[in-house]
Amino acid sequence: MTESVLDYMTRLGRAAREASRVIGRASTAQKNRALQATAAALDEARAELSAANALDLANGQANGLEPAMLERLALTPARIDSMIVGLRQVAGLADPVGAIRDMSYRPSGIQVGKMRVPLGVVGIIYESRPNVTIDAASLCLKSGNATILRGGSEAIHSNRAIAACIERGLAEARLPAAVVQVVETTDRAAVGALITMPEYVDVIVPRGGKGLIERVSRDARVPVIKHLDGICHVYVSAHADLAKAQKIAFNAKTYRYGICGAMETLLVDQTIAADFLPAMAAQFREKGVELRGCERTRDLIDVIPATEDDWHTEYLAAILSIRVVSGLDEAIEHINHYGSHHSDAIVSDHQSQIRRFMAEVDSSSVMVNAPTSFADGFEYGLGAEIGISTDKLHARGPVGLEGLTCEKYIVIGDGQLRGQA
């Protein structure tokens, strides 16, 4: 069985590599036509999509999937609407492919600059949410990449139905079906094959739980764009507007508990902790948030004692750790030690503090007087995102269309020869 899965994935990889050469040179109009046609196909296939999703939901219930997983799995009419809107939005985004910048003349007379080009073949591994199939396919297509999509086994019927719509859209734009391929097998060996085919796959983007991302990072022979955790902090400094800080901290935690940009630890300067924490804690309790705190926090409000593990934990739930710190130095030290380099915020009106925080906090996004919940490609003006990277090579932060491309140097001459004036 493993051999047949390997052969199957090799066929997908070979087809994707060939298709990448076609989509890489496709015009913006042709790519946009495929996106718009896919949106129309989804709209026409609502009944088929709902029926396929109902089968996945029934199987999920029978297999004991947790309610939260079932909720992410559901393709509601509103989510189908959102997929359609998303495709049309991506069609409206500027095409990064072929953009040329930094052209300059060198003393030799040649011109040197950079051109933005697709990465090639992008492998995407994700869990549960079938709408990711459309998000990923649309961004890869618009950025001129072929893609191989390996969704979770629990969404296999939904993903197949969505793939049929994508295939119709590609056909209408006269693009190869292999530009977007959805892995049909639920065998987990497919993941192992996908992440070890550097001859066919240029980059892997895993989207899912920590176990999946750790496995991909450990075993891949292909570059990986990923983040492991979203352990995000908000630091309320001694120079903060406390009313503003309370609103920011509340939004950072409660906007959505399950997003990777949700605040997991609140750091409060000792100078203002007694004035700030009682009202802040009352607001969180009213919302049903469980509070855990350090010893200095517990001297001020009644909370569960925080352990060392709490500072390392991405809760993705209505739980918040609170730590009172001596000042900016301790706040930065805590964030850089315990954080996941995702998104961290300071609330302060002191400009030198703000500049230090922005420069010294080692995270892919640093917020000033704004909640970490803003860590999102759409909010950043990228239109959409394939994921958020906490790595430092190639892409960092929300990865949109430009993050799915790279640059090559272009050199233009008129017969100049090296070594000759």
UniProtKB/Swiss-Prot annotation:
It is found in: Cytoplasm. Catalyzes the NADPH-dependent reduction of L-glutamate 5-phosphate into L-glutamate 5-semialdehyde and phosphate. The product spontaneously undergoes cyclization to form 1-pyrroline-5-carboxylate. It comes from Pseudomonas savastanoi pv. phaseolicola (strain 1448A / Race 6) (Pseudomonas syringae pv. phaseolicola (strain 1448A / Race 6)). One of its GO terms (cellular component) is cytoplasm. Pathway: Amino-acid biosynthesis; L-proline biosynthesis; L-glutamate 5-semialdehyde from L-glutamate: step 2/2. This is Gamma-glutamyl phosphate reductase. Disulfide bonds: none annotated. The keyword Amino-acid biosynthesis applies. Belongs to the gamma-glutamyl phosphate reductase family. The keyword Oxidoreductase applies. GO terms for biological process: L-proline biosynthetic process. NCBIfam families: PRK00197.1 (NF001221), proA (TIGR00407). It holds the Pfam family Aldedh. Gene3D superfamilies: Aldehyde Dehydrogenase, Chain A, domain 1 (3.40.605.10), Aldehyde Dehydrogenase, Chain A, domain 2 (3.40.309.10).
